[in-house]
Amino acid sequence: MLGSLRLAVLRFALAVALTLSAGVAAAHAHPHVWITATSELVYGPDGSFTGVRHTWAFDDMFSTYALQGIETKQKGVYTREDLAPLAQTNVESLKEFAFFTFAKAEGKKAKFNEPVDYYLDVKDNVLTLHFFLPLKTPMNTKEYAVEVFDPSYFIDFTFVEKEPVKLAGAPAGCAIKFDRPNDNSANAQRMSEDNFMNGDNSNYGAMFANKIAVKCP
């Protein structure tokens, strides 16, 4: 069953479709939500990689939709407390999709625990989700990789240009190699909604993965 976040997006997509003029293919392509991201790879005192701290800023349209109906003490001003129920819904929904974060070391996939220290804030009408995704078992390996993407490409992740990924508390000499996805947007535009929903392209979004490789001495 689709999670709350995905259902909300689907309702939003339908609402947009109904506003389009007749004859226009409303849901002709993925993605439906755009996220501008930054990530921080966090290390423990012993030099092990402990998890990923994500900051995900949603696109203007989704931000506006998601904030509808949220009660605030001051109109247009959202506190963390006001947004706490929505933040909880979001992180609970992310579990179904593996938090769109995939880690691997020495040829083996690493598993994450559920997010902690999560909250939402709003700045310049943009809704941003902050959370820390801890590894179930911290990594003490010299090399590892992390990828961020939605396998179904329902959501597009674009990392900021300046300092898209940072190391926090890493041992001296550790270096990051960050690769953005190739531009396959034209192909995505040519794929209809039916193509995505029939299951044949359940991992289509892997072509749009943001790839992070870390190497330490």
Language-model regions, residue ranges each:
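N-terminal secretory signal peptides that target proteins for export/translocation
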Residues: M1-A8
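Bacterial N-terminal signal peptides
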Residues: L10-G23
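Early extracytoplasmic/domain-onset interaction patches
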Residues: P31-F58, F62-T64
